[in-house]
């Protein structure tokens, strides 16, 4: 096992220049032209299949790099956190992003690596041994979801990609993430130390959150990925009692269980979240772990970490206790090299929120379950599933009345169906189906929330012009709140 020269003989600049260097805008284009020129008039050139495969791979690599540049350009130019930390770049002037954003990622990674190298130099022999283990470890990357993302090929899309394709699904990306770090064009993964065993995954939650019943695991990284030591937006490590493997630490250690809850950040305060590219990530993880171990007053924990024979599972327990590693791949992952592991059953509501048609069909086998499913669809504003259920089952006005009487569905307990059909964010196509098929009365007044209002009141409040126009054409009137 070998430690990089950067750690053996540390000689790092005190300040990493974060100003983007200039690149030749034609460099990659010329290289691409040179590599794909072989396919010109291929019918007469007698070119080999191996050569054609090489040309195709070159084009794929170029496109993958171009997509990554777009994702990083968006993140570094739009994220307000990067602007406040003087780590931002200018937005591209044209429609296309240059590879300058990828160069910027490398510079930002070197900046954070420089910070932690200076903080931890020099290393003891125990520290060097632990660092060598981490650097030479294989990683698994885990994406959890209630959606069915694979058949023979695993396809995971970023929130931005999903939105651009008008796909309706439950999201874990919030407005604060988009505004402050703008990393909504990346796919997210938890990170584990590989133990090369069949027992996967080692962890089932990330940052205390169970993101889904299906774990999709890959063992290969991306040349354009980046890693953060925590959730990129929420960089606070939770108290030990929220950790998935809390008993392991509570049973074996004392002081460290009170030390772990903290913000993980760089030199510019708690919003300064260290970022490492794929090449630097193992070194960054190792040095930050060593920095934490040095500060710990728990001698037993320190001895456990520096055990020369530490096994991969124990190392993973430590790293995902001290940190909550998060890996990000630009835009989309598509691979046939993966494992899918079902961790638990998926509830009907979770399957609906994830647009998991396979699970929905397995669970909704009769009209009674269809009532539940339709209520969940309306409550979660899942128009795609609502319309699917309406097309599959012959719903009547009596079905809607029975649905409203269900005691074990919170949406029907709290709201009238008419309210759910017309609330802010509801899809007017679903409302249109209900009215056109006589399932609800256009002017029925709400009996539960906003008692006395009608669907037109809701549409007026949300300023949904399509819904307003449709309701008015069908004779809708306002409820008593707006009567003069």
From Swiss-Prot:
Substrates-to-products reaction catalysed: L-arginyl-[protein] + NAD(+) = ADP-riboxanated L-argininyl-[protein] + nicotinamide + NH4(+) + H(+)
Effect annotated for changing residue 231 to A: Abolished arginine ADP-riboxanase activity
Effect caused by changing residue 131 to A: Abolished interaction with host calmodulin
Observed effect of gene inactivation: Host cells display increased pyroptosis.
Residues reported to bind NAD(+): 143-145, 155, 157, 169, 172-173
Presence of the UniProt keyword Lyase in the record: yes
GO cellular component: extracellular region; host cell cytoplasm
Swiss-Prot/TrEMBL GO biological process terms: symbiont-mediated perturbation of host programmed cell death; symbiont-mediated suppression of host calcium-mediated signal transduction; symbiont-mediated suppression of host programmed cell death; symbiont-mediated suppression of host signal transduction pathway
Effect in UniProt of substituting residue 349 to A: Strongly reduced interaction with host CASP4/CASP11 and subsequent ADP-riboxanation of CASP4/CASP11
Result of altering residue 188 to A: Abolished arginine ADP-riboxanase activity
Keywords: ANK repeat, Host cytoplasm, Lyase, NAD, Plasmid, Repeat, Secreted, Toxin, Virulence
Physiological role: ADP-riboxanase effector that inhibits host cell pyroptosis. Acts by mediating arginine ADP-riboxanation of host CASP4/CASP11, blocking CASP4/CASP11 autoprocessing. This prevents CASP4 activation and ability to recognize and cleave GSDMD, thereby inhibiting LPS-induced pyroptosis. ADP-riboxanation takes place in two steps: OspC3 first catalyzes ADP-ribosylation of target Arg, and then initiates a deamination to remove one N-omega group.
Subunit details: Interacts with host calmodulin (CALM1, CALM2 and/or CALM3); specifically interacts with the apo form of calmodulin, preventing calcium-binding.
Name of this chain's protein: Arginine ADP-riboxanase OspC3
Organism whose genome encodes this protein: Shigella flexneri
Lineage: Bacteria, Pseudomonadati, Pseudomonadota, Gammaproteobacteria, Enterobacterales
């Amino acid at each position: 096992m070998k430690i990089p020269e950067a750690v053996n003989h540390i000689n790092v600049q005190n300040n990493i220049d974060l100003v983007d260097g200039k690149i030749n805008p034609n460099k990659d284009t010329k290289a691409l032209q040179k590599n794909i020129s072989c396919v010109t008039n291929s019918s007469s050139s007698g070119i080999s299949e191996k050569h054609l495969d090489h040309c195709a791979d070159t084009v794929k690599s170029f496109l993958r790099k171009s997509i990554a540049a777009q994702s990083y350009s968006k993140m570094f130019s739009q994220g307000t956190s990067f602007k406040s930390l003087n780590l931002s770049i200018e937005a591209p002037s044209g429609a296309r992003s240059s590879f300058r954003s990828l160069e910027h990622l490398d510079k930002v990674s070197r900046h954070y690596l420089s910070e932690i190298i200076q903080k931890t130099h020099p290393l003891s022999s125990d520290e060097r041994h632990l660092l060598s283990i981490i650097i030479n470890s294989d990683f698994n990357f885990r994406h959890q979801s209630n959606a069915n993302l694979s058949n023979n090929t695993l396809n995971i899309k970023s929130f931005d990609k999903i939105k651009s394709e008008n796909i309706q699904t439950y999201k874990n990306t919030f407005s604060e993430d988009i505004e402050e770090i703008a990393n909504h064009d990346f796919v997210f993964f938890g990170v584990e130390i590989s133990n090369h065993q069949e027992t996967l995954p080692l962890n089932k939650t990330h940052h205390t959150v169970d993101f889904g019943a299906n774990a999709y695991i890959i063992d290969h990284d991306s040349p354009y990925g980046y890693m953060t030591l925590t959730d990129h937006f929420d960089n606070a490590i939770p108290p030990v009692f929220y950790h998935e493997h809390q008993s392991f630490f509570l049973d074996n250690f004392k002081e460290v269980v009170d030390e772990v809850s903290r913000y993980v950040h760089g030199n510019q305060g708690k919003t300064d979240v260290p970022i490492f590219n794929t090449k630097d990530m193992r070194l960054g993880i190792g040095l930050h772990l060593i920095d934490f171990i040095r500060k710990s007053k728990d001698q037993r924990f320190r001895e456990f970490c520096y055990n020369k024979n530490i096994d991969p599972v124990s190392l993973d327990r430590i790293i995902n206790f001290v940190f909550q590693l998060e890996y990000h791949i630009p835009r989309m992952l598509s691979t046939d090299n993966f494992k899918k592991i079902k961790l638990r059953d998926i509830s009907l509501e979770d399957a609906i929120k994830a647009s998991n048609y396979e699970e929905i069909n397995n669970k909704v086998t009769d009209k009674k379950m269809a009532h539940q499913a339709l209520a969940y669809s309306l409550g979660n504003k899942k128009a795609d599933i609502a319309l699917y259920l309406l097309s599959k089952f012959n719903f009547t006005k009596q079905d809607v009345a029975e649905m409203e009487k269900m005691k074990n569905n919170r949406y029907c307990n709290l709201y009238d169906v008419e309210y759910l059909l017309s609330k802010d964010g509801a899809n007017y196509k679903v409302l249109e189906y209900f009215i056109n098929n006589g399932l609800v009365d256009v002017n029925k007044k709400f009996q539960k929330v906003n008692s006395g209002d009608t669907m037109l009141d809701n549409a007026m409040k949300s300023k949904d012009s399509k819904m307003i126009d449709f309701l008015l054409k069908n004779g809708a009137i306002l409820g008593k709140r707006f009567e003069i």
